[in-house]
Regions:
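Regulatory sensory and allosteric helical modules in signal-transduction proteins
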Residues: 60, 64-112
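A generic fold-level signal
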Residues: 52, 112-114
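Intrinsically disordered, low-complexity terminal regulatory regions
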Residues: 1-68
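A short, aliphatic-rich beta-strand micro-motif
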Residues: 115-119
Length: 119
């Protein structure tokens, strides 16, 4: 699949990029039953298609988030409920967009190179 991944043309908007990727992701994951394998591939596709600094997931384990598959620099392994952007999004049950992490109270700097987050 990686060799045949079709990406949007240079300058395409986010919506168009997602529309092109969605059927490919469905095809990529339709015959695979392993959650980790599918999550890992979806993350790799998103990183390649959008060039994000970091793409990954955390899994809820008791009262903390535990790092799952990701692409990018080293990440925090565990994040407590209600802490940082990820823990706050989990606690509040909502998506959080942070344009400037320095402006987010309690931001956890897993990487000093990260300047924004979408959780």
């Amino acid at each position: 699949m990686a060799e045949s991944l079709q990406l949007a043309e240079e300058g395409a908007g986010k919506k168009e990029r997602y529309e092109i990727l969605l059927p490919q992701l469905e095809h990529l994951t339709e015959d695979e039953t392993d959650l980790i394998a599918n999550v890992a591939n979806v993350i790799a596709v998103l990183k390649e298609a959008f060039g994000f600094f970091w793409v990954g997931v955390y899994f809820v384990r008791a009262e903390e988030l535990v790092l799952g598959p990701f692409q990018g620099p080293l990440a925090c392994t565990r994040i407590a409920y209600g802490k940082g952007v990820c823990g706050t999004a989990w606690k509040d049950g909502r998506t959080i967009v942070v344009d400037d992490v320095d402006e987010f109270p309690g931001h956890i700097a897993c990487s000093s190179l990260s300047k924004s987050e979408l959780v």
